[in-house]
Amino acid sequence: MERVIYAVGLGPGDYEMITLKAKKVLEESDIIFLSGGKVFNGYDEVKKLLDNINCGSKLKFYEYPENKNYRHAHIKHFAVETVKYLEKGMKVSYVTMGDMTIYSSFPDIYKELAKHNVVLKAVTGISSFFAPASLTGNSIVDWKDKEAIIQHTEDYNEIENILESFSAV
């Protein structure tokens, strides 16, 4: 039996912007995981979104520590627990706001799941930083512009160089 985890992007926080494919996968799931930190984890927001599509009762929170020293042990534990659900024949999904490939804990988690021969089926969501442009009718970049997406930084020299080099940041 193939072990599959569905990584589902929920979009920018509006249940009407959850893709039809994401909704179908979540409705068919037996358990839906969400990870996050202790302080802000998005649980209430995600629960509300899933309640709107009648899937909130399937949601299970998994702590993803901010502290890198503890993170790996938590990820290993999560992978082992996930495999137990999969071995019972359950359909397991993992949700993120926006898209699971951008500013998400899922890539780290999937690396560990892959060690257990778990196959990824990604259901991408509407990336959160594209939603405002769509809502306002503006483009993020024009034809010859250059766009940069950067990880968090507090290095003002780096920010200054990026702002000088790119039209949209």
Where are the regions a protein language model picked out?
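A contiguous loop/helix-start segment that scaffolds small-molecule binding in enzyme catalytic cores
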Residues: 5-7, 87, 161-169
